[in-house]
Amino acid sequence: MAGVSVESKVSSLVCNLSSTSGLIRRTANPHPNVWGYDFVHSLKSPYTDSSYRERADALVVEIKAMLNAAIAGDGESTITPSAYDTAWVARVPAIDGSARPQFPQTVDWILKNQLKDGSWGIESHFLLSDRLLATLSCVIALFKWNVGDLQVKQGIEFIKSNLELVKDESDQDSLVTDFEIIFPSLLREAQSLSLELPYDLPYIHLLQTKRQERLAKVSREEIYTVPSPLLYSLEGIQDIVEWDRIMDVQGQDGSFLSSPASTACVFIDVKCLEFLNNVMMKLGNFVPCLYPVDLLERLLIVDNIERLGIYRHFEKEINEALDYVYRHWNERGIGWGTRNPIADLETTALGFLLLRLHRYNVSPAVFDNFKDSNGQFFCSTGQLNKDVASMLSLYRASQLAFPGEDILDEAKSFTTKYLREALEKSETSSAWNNKQNLSQEIKYALKTSWHASVARVEAKRYCQVYRPDYARLAKSVYRLPYVNNEKFLELGKLDFNIIQAIHQEEMKTVTSWFRDSGLPLFTFARERPLEFYFLVATGTYEPQYAKCRFLFTKVACLQTVLDDMYDTYGTLDELKLFTEAVRRWDLSFTENLPDYMKLCYKIYYDIVHEVAWEAEKEQGRELVSFFRKGWEDYLLGYYEEAEWLASEYVPSLDEYIKNGITSIGQRILLLSGVLIMDGQLLSQEALEKVDYPGRRVLTELNSLISRLADDTKTYKAEKARGELASSIECYMKDHPECTEEEALAHIYSILEPAVKELTREFLKPDDVPFACKKMLFEETRVTMVIFKDGDGFGVSKLEVKDHIKESLIDPLPL
């Protein structure tokens, strides 16, 4: 403090505190600070070195070029070859009537791309159903053109050696799409060509039975009138197709559900040829299993970039990708590509999730198209199967519910049950999805609510599970190299560590300030400087917001002393004087205060002035009076609670909540950060859209949620200290017949819709800088994490400590 050393303040304070003989003061018995000054200052990150920043900058440039190729195109996509589909295209005869293939380059590709074991497929990913389907398809194509005798022989040997083993992949999640439809059909064709294969295996008969059962459920008439998922596998149902009628459901691009194999199988008119010519012209000598996948690919790219925590580098590219998707969005849902007439649940759910997160106007009514008459959700219209990845996407989308969106509540309930069952199944299964880390994704998603999660921990965890070589299932195993690649992962890890290194330097500044601030002298209060830094830094983590983080942390540390002073240490007479001093905003009035309060008031006065002045510099208008009024309201709320305590008064729940929204202190804390965000101007009109006492906007909802979330985890400890007023106790006073468990359930019934309101306020389009809304929203998310499993501020050595280690202490190995 100016003119007085910290040492003399220490001596004076200790002397005067110990001289209050006969006065019994309550204490919260705070747990000690788990993050020592010496520990924080021992942190030394190598990622402060400029070479890491230079490498990250280079990666950003490389990825931007890659994204421009993927996102700025005209619907094209980058996808790995499908040997299965390429073989079908290779079978198309020349349109001039000569005895040669129309696309001879595909035959050459097949000859050159057989794997060492005699199979065809993606060498890096082995799935037996995929290899068998591709290999048999390639063998038939080569046999038809009487070429590649050696390759045919080796392919047949592979099929003979492995055909019986495919029964071990009989789990639906481990089979390529429509395997039970297509493979028996291919086997019949192979048998008609006298290819020597084991046609009488028990599993083959089982497959044929499954095929018949599935086809028995298909309306033959609907195949020709309504686009059906079976169009994707027409080559597997040639025995039931009326070829002159099937043209009625041909796509505008000439394809059948964007499938090169189906289209090559039909190959009746010039439109089929145009589609195949177009694909061959774009890709050269092979075709993929789907073309195009432009909607799904864009969504997956954006999703991965955001979950890896690197989205701030690619905002322009993300906006272009989502604009493209939104242009093709419709109330029926969307498929994996713009030319696909059938809506797909995974693509639709992911589209809804990302579009809503970016404040596009999308309605959850789209999911009514994916419900059957029993209220169960399925993956695509006309196909009543459920795919784990699709259900996971729907589960994630359901967490973005606004008030009144019952369909999303239904989706959340349904997918939670479905995913739990899938998880139990995966623990005893070697299913493909389990091998691809999907079970880890499910486990984490079910455990961690989006509303109660830490952005930096989420990014770190995703870096740990993200697979650059991730493959997906359709009729073939395929990869999307622009979606999963080494560059994304390297930048994700580098960026996390670089940001963490910046935060560690800021943590040293915070702990140095705290040590010298005088706040540690108040031994009755909790010391949580790092926890409060964590509260803001893990959501508003960008380097340019350092001042916002620092001042937010200062205010939070001050609030903790005030909280414990009003809650436990101060007498009612002392608190009345302190509250009056705050109201008067006059340092001379502090002469009436006890010595410990004099020091507290001086620290308070300096911090409030500092925050107000910094806000004025950032916003360009007078704000000292605004902050003074906010602090006055806040401490008056504290004082009212102190009066309740002194008189053993338990208010009604409504009275408690009205005061608690103010006394929780979240409003003034949030304003001490959001008004000091570098480059983010908040006009008075814009500010009132996120902060208006008594109106359910972001700061009000944050305060309500924080108050009630706090109560659900602290009311027992506070009751043991003699504090009778909590939302639980107040509800029980209003309803004497109810139990504690019923009161707690009622509080949660208030919390849940408030969280939906908060989500709506956060994501609705307006003229408030989105970075400011994000800061307010992210702080709420972290607050909910802190009170998820207990009082994370009061006892910060458990889950909160782990979150701090993950986000601020331990780097990601490169």
From Swiss-Prot:
Gene Ontology biological process terms in this record: diterpenoid biosynthetic process
Keywords carried by this UniProt record: Lyase, Magnesium, Manganese, Metal-binding
Gene3D superfamilies linked to this entry: 1.50.10.160, Farnesyl Diphosphate Synthase (1.10.600.10), Terpene synthase, N-terminal domain (1.50.10.130)
Tissues expressing this chain: Expressed in young and mature roots.
Pathway: Terpene metabolism; oleoresin biosynthesis
CDD domains: Terpene_cyclase_plant_C1
Cofactors (names): Mg(2+); Mn(2+)
Top EC class, one word: lyase
Chain positions recorded as Mg(2+) 2 binding sites: D563, D567
Molecular-function GO term, any one: terpene synthase activity
Similarity comment text for this entry: Belongs to the terpene synthase family. Tpsd subfamily.
Entry protein name: Alpha-bisabolene synthase
Species of provenance: Pseudolarix amabilis (Golden larch)
Native organism taxonomy: Eukaryota, Viridiplantae, Streptophyta, Embryophyta, Tracheophyta
